[in-house]
């Protein structure tokens, strides 16, 4: 009889097998045409996005972060080729959708080299999982939903919907469920699958086969309003879906009695179980059967269950972030070095008692840095002063005009436009040896932390506006940052030229 294999050896072999599996999953299967995105073998589930044939984990080699490699397959190559331009137009516009509570679509390209045509697009990877998964874990651990967390989540979802609905024409999500809403470890909410409804509506009938409606899944039927599929999609569709998500967040799970489909009775029981009358009224107005009676996403942000007067700290944080491009990256650290920590920051007078003083030493600068990062990431949107239209709204997702035959003339190849915003600007000017020009060094820090350093020999005839416009034209600067950079350069030119006069 053979002696049993020693336990340490078996453990080592199992560990080796796990390492081999891990290496297999990290194998690079494919690379984007530009070489930046590398598709891995490991498949990921980003909320059962309908219509996606495959979703893989990928690596952004420029930023060193994980992203998602999504693929849409089209078997009919002829039909695909006939509508290729329309598909490109839709994705060009989707890349422009930029909001902290919406999963970002970074890049797309078409692949027609194989028998099956593909649309490949890269999206942000949300590693913490879907809202549905989080709610299941919370319920399993026998924990109740915290009312403050519920309000914060609702505010972030409505912030994203308000942005989409304020576009011209409005962007209808049309597939909002707890499977397509994601939550990060820090409480940041991200809405995914924004592309699905727009893309499926833009496609002709002969290309819609790979786009499967989420409504085919019985377990998610209750997220869709009664009028769904019978009338043209409107913003009220998303409000109903949001109301069902808000209800599910409040009760953690809507019981199904073992059935696959969530029944009206189960939804009614969940509504009646809510102890907060304001929360119940808020959800009921979203779930109104008549779409005309459902409020807008923007007006829901002012409902008494969500509305609160923003603290001065939050207002200051938003103001700080909006103007951060004028400050060095480590501005908090630099300012605290020069600060007298024993100095009085604020004083509260008290009758017949000494005033209550608050000193700089009592401020946790580490907590302040974390708070600023949370505000920057979109966890605390500033909604009480929000305009009815999002600032810097791109001209996105307008229905394509009627096919007009245009005479094709040779035109230069357009440059890729920059989609990332600038969060910090630094500029330095040095006089050339011949004193005839200035040597400009410009550092732009983009929102994904990419540092872009540009140099330019400035002539006396060059203007700040022309320079900013040129950077936009050649794809070095986002269009929304044109005026901001022009003003920054103008003030820098005046300062340097004034000292040299």
Swiss-Prot record:
SUPFAM superfamilies: Protein kinase-like (PK-like). Residues 38-306 form the Protein kinase domain. Residues 1-33 are annotated as: Disordered. Its main location: cytoplasm. GO terms for biological process: DNA damage response; negative regulation of macroautophagy; negative regulation of neuron apoptotic process; neuron differentiation. InterPro entries: Kinase-like_dom_sf, NRBP2_PK, Prot_kinase_dom, WNK_Ser-Thr_kinase. The modification Phosphothreonine is found at residues 409, 411. Residues 20-30 have a biased composition (Acidic residues). The keyword Cytoplasm applies. The keyword Acetylation does not apply. May regulate apoptosis of neural progenitor cells during their differentiation. This is Nuclear receptor-binding protein 2. It comes from Homo sapiens (Human). The lineage of its organism: Eukaryota, Metazoa, Chordata, Craniata, Vertebrata. The gene is NRBP2.
